[in-house]
Amino acid sequence: MRIATYNVEWFDALFDRNANPLIDQKWSSRYNVTRADQWHAVGQVMRAIDADCILVVEAPNHKTGRSTVDMLERFADEFGLRAAQAALGFTNDTQQELAFLYHPHRCSIRHVPMSAPDFPRFDGTYAIDLDVDAVTDPINFSKPPFEAELVCHDGRRITLIGAHLKSKAPHGAKSKDEAMLISIANRRKQLAQALWIRGRVDQVLDEGAEEIVLGD
């Protein structure tokens, strides 16, 4: 079983508002790269990886009139990928989804969100004291991790957590001091998100299950 992860920068920009591929000589959202060149380059990489299961980070945006699953499966069909079926976790508002492509004759994947008293579902809110002031701070994911159950063709089950954590740039800062404060706050938030995932990992391992965390 070959499992991979691939962050496809601005994959969303390779499809129009009706989910049709944009394979032309206009510029992609990548610097100095046409949409056709990016489309074919990503396809060549995925064919070379030849994975049974691929976590696609920054998968095309899922919204009214556009299905992430349909767009990924159309892409997989275009390049004859073995990982030809797609599964989507929680959607988000960033235009960058987390999704899996998988080989249906080798495995199956389904979204199975988990929860625990101290570590809620990833689309919920995690309470933690970030700045050691004895006051809990609410933490959310802009891109909730994708918790999935991978079932191999031989019946083996593995829990997958696909994640995309970011420590955002200090947008809106008006001075170096303000930029420093915002950067520190963002780093603390990223650390809290990592602790949230770590808590889920421990929960799964304590149950005796196998687990893989992958992504950015």
Predicted regions and their residues:
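N-terminal, active-site-proximal structural segment of metallo-dependent hydrolase catalytic domains
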Residues: 1-98, 173
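Active-site regions of metal-assisted phosphoester/phosphodiester hydrolases
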Residues: 1-33, 39, 43, 103-215
